[in-house]
Amino acid sequence: MVISLNSCLSFICLLLCHWIGTASPLNLEDPNVCSHWESYSVTVQESYPHPFDQIYYTSCTDILNWFKCTRHRVSYRTAYRHGEKTMYRRKSQCCPGFYESGEMCVPHCADKCVHGRCIAPNTCQCEPGWGGTNCSSACDGDHWGPHCTSRCQCKNGALCNPITGACHCAAGFRGWRCEDRCEQGTYGNDCHQRCQCQNGATCDHVTGECRCPPGYTGAFCEDLCPPGKHGPQCEQRCPCQNGGVCHHVTGECSCPSGWMGTVCGQPCPEGRFGKNCSQECQCHNGGTCDAATGQCHCSPGYTGERCQDECPVGTYGVLCAETCQCVNGGKCYHVSGACLCEAGFAGERCEARLCPEGLYGIKCDKRCPCHLENTHSCHPMSGECACKPGWSGLYCNETCSPGFYGEACQQICSCQNGADCDSVTGKCTCAPGFKGIDCSTPCPLGTYGINCSSRCGCKNDAVCSPVDGSCTCKAGWHGVDCSIRCPSGTWGFGCNLTCQCLNGGACNTLDGTCTCAPGWRGEKCELPCQDGTYGLNCAERCDCSHADGCHPTTGHCRCLPGWSGVHCDSVCAEGRWGPNCSLPCYCKNGASCSPDDGICECAPGFRGTTCQRICSPGFYGHRCSQTCPQCVHSSGPCHHITGLCDCLPGFTGALCNEVCPSGRFGKNCAGICTCTNNGTCNPIDRSCQCYPGWIGSDCSQPCPPAHWGPNCIHTCNCHNGAFCSAYDGECKCTPGWTGLYCTQRCPLGFYGKDCALICQCQNGADCDHISGQCTCRTGFMGRHCEQKCPSGTYGYGCRQICDCLNNSTCDHITGTCYCSPGWKGARCDQAGVIIVGNLNSLSRTSTALPADSYQIGAIAGIIILVLVVLFLLALFIIYRHKQKGKESSMPAVTYTPAMRVVNADYTISGTLPHSNGGNANSHYFTNPSYHTLTQCATSPHVNNRDRMTVTKSKNNQLFVNLKNVNPGKRGPVGDCTGTLPADWKHGGYLNELGAFGLDRSYMGKSLKDLGKNSEYNSSNCSLSSSENPYATIKDPPVLIPKSSECGYVEMKSPARRDSPYAEINNSTSANRNVYEVEPTVSVVQGVFSNNGRLSQDPYDLPKNSHIPCHYDLLPVRDSSSSPKQEDSGGSSSNSSSSSE
């Protein structure tokens, strides 16, 4: 890579300016301050090897061609191209989870700590009693304290104080942990309640509920078990039958009378009754007794308490309930009711006469003398007449005597109050005024006449006669139906008394008492009401406030002028004044007039005799005495009444100095804005000022494609399919593109979205910046181009077939044939002879000579051998001469990745003295182009140590330390030239970097400070850029290549710019992936040790370099300014041996 000195200095100035402008105010000692790497791009010129087929000549045994043979080899020349290099710088900011607060970084909690404080990112320290990620959750019932970490010790459902952990016992428990129940006889909260249970019941310690003993129930166990229940909680069913009652505790049955047994299921045996069947029955004539009461149940034909009597005459059967059916004097049997007939009769009921009807006598020859209509029959033997009911007499021709009726007129009538009795049935016919079966009930009030069927017409509580319905009037009434009051001036019964009331007093028609007219009093209403009273009986008191008394009859107040109302307590109504408020006011604009004299009292904002004029401009209020405020956005002076400013549309506030609140517009801010999508509403005319990215009258339309910003006036400049933000025009690049406008491809070694994916291509293959697909270089294949072309193929895509013969090998890149011994030619198809030649040690092309070269004579062999020896000797002398001016210490090229940077860089290997135990730094090179420290004019102090080192001063300046270098081995004093890597601005570990992201191993105040140190005497050191000649290294130390396939390296040397490649001895122990090597420090130091071997790490391959396994390095420049230059001593010897 080649960068000019001016470009380098400009870039340093740019970085310094950037650091000064963006210096972080954060306290770097704050443990919460972190650093991160940010990338930026610079345009650089990089070199790359360009292969070509080189034809050269060498000595051989071909006598026909005068011992000169043509050879082919693939050589590379350095070409240049421009590219972008991604560089990195360190920037300080708050660590993730923290935010800036002054100079400190304080933790940030996404969720606000509701009951606590934020002590770490998204970590809240909660107050006692609170938990959860944001301390918003109260402790559950089992935990207390900060973050609810302490477990509660409360028992039996007690509540735990979330702050102190103290137990609040549930009802029924006590103690520190609520582990004890309430004492016997107490219950409830804090065991303060006294139990009220009775009959030996126990009390529940929580609720106070009574647990009753067997046989009791009720809230307080005060009741016995209900019938049919007994035992604990009255849950057991009584087994007693037939009405037996069980004991409420034991359940033992107490049987009713007539039953016995354990469950009262056995009736008393015959002849026994009573409780427990303990009594003996006393019934006669075959009667049985009731087992419960002992009452006798008589057999048919008997009656009496103990069944000792026969049925009465005319009855028979069970309970003597049957009536005998015997007629004509027949007698019936008291048991069965059978009839025993008298003489002259026969039949089951003695109903049959032995003589024909109407005859009697022994021979039935006599005619009966009875009245036939009133007679049942005459006796067949004696001729005696049997009268029908209601008739009597010897021949049944007489009615019953008054007061009697029925069969033989034996029954006595029950009619009362002069009622008539029917002689046959005894039915009563009541006299007027009575009713009922026996006519003993007088007519109800309001009825009269026969059977009380007529309704009375008397009124006003007059008494109605039950006989004829005539009315007897009460005092004060008269008339047929007592509906007419006594005439005025009369009173009493019959209205025959005269009233004595005066002054219009009314007389009571009942008792003649006077009811005075309003305003009068006295027994005869002869006295007027006293002052202050009025109305009936002068019982009302005048209620007047501003009056000259009240009317004695009506109580109306006589109001004074200016007052009105029922009580004269109201000022004259608005618009009225004077006596009785009878005069109208002439005041205007809402003014009021004095009720006494009618003078106008103007309302606020008006003036004048009748208040007809408004306040003068600039004044308002009562009597126009107040001055208007200074209205800002108003249409004129303030309102003459209220003093409020009349705001223009879009303004509000007392002084119209406030814009309408968001979302409102217009006069008095009454309108509602319709702007959407965060659009700002104009408070005056409602027009919308749209948020960037939106347009339209209400900002509801997004910007058209390819436009952005306010009113979508800007045109998007995004390329390669990038999405353009309508808000700020920011380009969201598609995969494979980056840059402000997505015009730049991903940097070398990166691809995909945001260029975040790392390319995996090897062997200099190109990585597609979009998909990451590898485009292999000539001679390679595979997904990551990790494989060489298979044997027999070469070229791009390995599509070309090798044309090499005679077991020769084919170069997988160019197809050049490498002949087997004894063969030559482009295709190895020509026979040759083997000679010993001094091929350039860097060439990979070997010459194969045919086996028949031994046919040459001994003379030719001797001649060639001598020539070869002379040629080698000449080469050795020339090489020694060229090496005299070179440094004894040569820089080695080392590739050391750090932080997994893909576009690999080159470093100059060396040893860094670690001050204060600091870690080593790593430096990176994208392309083989270098900065070089130029010569220093004066010599430093030296000692006998063969070493050149680069050290850091305490102010982090980079110096070349030469005090330990042997002056006899290192050439001129001015050779303080060292190679700086192209991106020396990068840093390694964070503690080796400055606040602006530059590697302190390289940066200092000025390289001129080198001469100020007491141990240094050099000066005029500056940065320069130069391209150095090739140099060839033979047998370098152990390599750490990315792939074991590469075995050569190239350095520039002044002798031959087209030097072929030298074979390098690889070590299998170093075959590992260089991208996983930890960052190391690489500075300038001596390459060779005393034993002539390299003492530094080998060359590693960059992952995305087009250089196939070699690197260009700028060696230390030769200087002829010192007289000690020719003193090569052992230095030249070491250099020569190492070179060879």
UniProtKB/Swiss-Prot annotation:
Domain EGF-like: 106-136, 144-179, 187-222, 230-265, 278-308, 316-351, 405-440, 453-483, 491-526, 539-569, 577-612, 665-700, 713-743, 751-786, 799-829
TM annotation in the entry: 858-878
Impact upon substituting Y1030F: Abolishes tyrosine phosphorylation. Unable to enhance cell proliferation
Region (Necessary for formation of large intracellular vacuoles): 945-1140
Chain intervals for the UniProt region annotation (Necessary for interaction with AP2M1, self-assembly and formation of the irregular, mosaic-like adhesion pattern): 1-857
Glycosylated sites: N134, N496
Residue span of region Disordered: 1111-1140
Cell location: Cell membrane; Cell projection, Phagocytic cup
Low complexity: compositionally biased ranges: 1128-1140
Spans within the Extracellular topological domain: 26-857
PTM comment, free text: Phosphorylated on tyrosine residues. Phosphorylation at Tyr-1030 may be important for muscle cell proliferation. Ubiquitinated; mono- and polyubiquitinated forms are detected.
Record-level GO cellular component terms: cell projection; phagocytic cup; plasma membrane
Pfam family, one: hEGF
One of the GO biological process terms: skeletal muscle satellite cell activation
Record's function text: Membrane receptor involved in phagocytosis by macrophages and astrocytes of apoptotic cells. Receptor for C1q, an eat-me signal, that binds phosphatidylserine expressed on the surface of apoptotic cells. Cooperates with ABCA1 within the process of engulfment. Promotes the formation of large intracellular vacuoles and may be responsible for the uptake of amyloid-beta peptides. Necessary for astrocyte-dependent apoptotic neuron clearance in the developing cerebellum. Plays role in muscle cell proliferation, adhesion and motility. Is also an essential factor in the regulation of myogenesis.
Family, similarity comment: Belongs to the MEGF family.
Protein's UniProt name: Multiple epidermal growth factor-like domains protein 10
